């Protein structure tokens, strides 16, 4: 196990640096990752009959998208002002308060590939949400959104992710067509 020290940190619930996370992403055998993940799960929830879940809320950042996928709701073009939206901070505030009142502690933020929402928009949004709700976890932006933000902001992926994390991003969801087989993805998007 060449990644033993990284696994030890994970099992001790110590945060991983981006470089270490990239190292295990590039080099760790899947079986090792599964073993570490299961060990960590058993450590946190020893009873094998107990399953836990996350209470969160999905809030769409915008429905404006230049991608043109056939399967999702992020389909408005910027000029379609009668249907296009960007969620306001007041709407976030209301929805987060509702979520917290129900025992939730995480916000899942996703949206389309808006041609005018670059890194500055997301940094400001994440900082404001964390300022208002410091304990809220932000689980936000799929891989296509991060790539889009990087491209229109003229940044590399690593810089984009580091800046988003510094602004309050806690984790990335794995969702959308990017998780599908290449042939299926091409057919539907």
Describe each model-derived feature in a short phrase.
Residues 1-31, 94, 100-101:
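Auxiliary Fe-S-binding modules of radical SAM enzymes
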Residues 11, 19-20, 48, 54, ...:
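Residue-level signal for pocket-adjacent positions within structured domains
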Residues 12, 26, 43-46, 101, ...:
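Secondary-structure boundary motif
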Residues 14, 57-59, 72, 178, ...:
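Flexible, active-site-adjacent loop/turn segments at secondary-structure boundaries
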Residues 21-24, 55-58, 111-115:
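Conserved short loop/turn motifs at secondary-structure junctions
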Residues 34-78, 84-108:
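N-terminal pre-triad scaffold of radical SAM enzymes
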Residues 76-189:
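Conserved Radical SAM active-site core
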């Amino acid at each position: 196990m060449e990644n033993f020290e990284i696994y030890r940190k994970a099992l001790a619930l110590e945060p991983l640096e981006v470089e270490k996370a990239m190292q295990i992403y590039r080099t760790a055998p899947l079986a090792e990752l599964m073993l570490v993940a299961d060990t960590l799960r058993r450590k946190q929830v020893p009873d094998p009959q107990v399953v836990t879940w996350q209470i969160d809320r999905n809030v769409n950042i915008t429905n404006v998208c230049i991608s043109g996928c056939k399967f999702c709701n992020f389909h408005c073009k910027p000029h379609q002002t009668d249907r296009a939206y960007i969620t306001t901070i007041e709407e976030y505030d209301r929805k987060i308060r509702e979520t917290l009142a129900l025992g939730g502690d995480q916000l899942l933020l996703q949206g389309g590939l808006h041609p005018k929402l670059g890194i500055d928009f997301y940094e400001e949004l994440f900082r404001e949400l964390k300022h208002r709700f410091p304990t809220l976890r932000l689980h936000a932006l799929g891989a296509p959104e991060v790539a889009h933000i990087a491209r229109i902001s003229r940044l590399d992926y690593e810089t984009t992710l580091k800046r988003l994390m510094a602004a309050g991003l806690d984790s990335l969801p794995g969702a959308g067509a990017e998780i599908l087989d290449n042939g299926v993805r091409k057919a539907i998007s």
